[in-house]
Amino acid sequence: MTDLSQQFDRLIAQTDLNVSELQKEQLLGYVALLHKWNKAYNLTSVRNPSEMVIKHILDSIVVSPKLSGERFIDVGTGPGLPGIPLAIMNPEKSFTLLDSLGKRIRFIKQVIHELKITNVTPIQSRVEEFQPEEKFDAVLSRAFASMTDMVNWCHHLPKEEDGVFLALKGIYSEEEANDLPEWCSVKNVATLIVPELEGERHLVTLAGKK
């Protein structure tokens, strides 16, 4: 068993997540591809594969139990975060991964081809120009500097009835929540426990006021 495989098992044992052998293989395969492509494409500032396991894989998949619905979009996905790890963990759900940079979308296409991931649709577009045929149960992102930016840029993406925004944040700020536009409010703040990751992590659920 490789060091990364042992590290992964140790980290997962500290969570309530159930990960199959295939999912583990795909998640670690994604780390290997990210590490390989990163040298030429500069996809992430995290250079070390063992750090990627914590900061990219675990940090993404701890969100998995919080997902409800079938259709998700990851806006500003970068190299596929958190979308690829979440798609691996939820093969029955569909994930659209949106980014404006071609090199990132090319990388994601390579990942889904090599790892045989069938529930991801990569799209190169600016968020404000992307008009989906069908809206989403949830809009995910860890890319936006503020929740206000996220809901303003992505307001046209969630389902009107019950669609939500899921913002992956470090420290949760009441001040930032108070700055949200009038039509939107915080529905829930969940503390995420990421084994061996320093600093706070939160998942903030936002929705339009009914």
From Swiss-Prot:
Pfam families linked to this entry: GidB
Cysteines engaged in disulfide bonds, as pairs: none
Enzyme Commission designation: 2.1.1.170
Catalytic reaction(s) noted: guanosine(527) in 16S rRNA + S-adenosyl-L-methionine = N(7)-methylguanosine(527) in 16S rRNA + S-adenosyl-L-homocysteine
Chain positions recorded as S-adenosyl-L-methionine binding sites: G76, L81, V127, E128, R142
Claim: S-adenosyl-L-methionine is one of the keywords in the record: yes
Function: Specifically methylates the N7 position of guanine in position 527 of 16S rRNA.
Family: Belongs to the methyltransferase superfamily. RNA methyltransferase RsmG family.
Protein's recorded name: Ribosomal RNA small subunit methyltransferase G
Taxonomic lineage: Bacteria, Pseudomonadati, Pseudomonadota, Gammaproteobacteria, Vibrionales
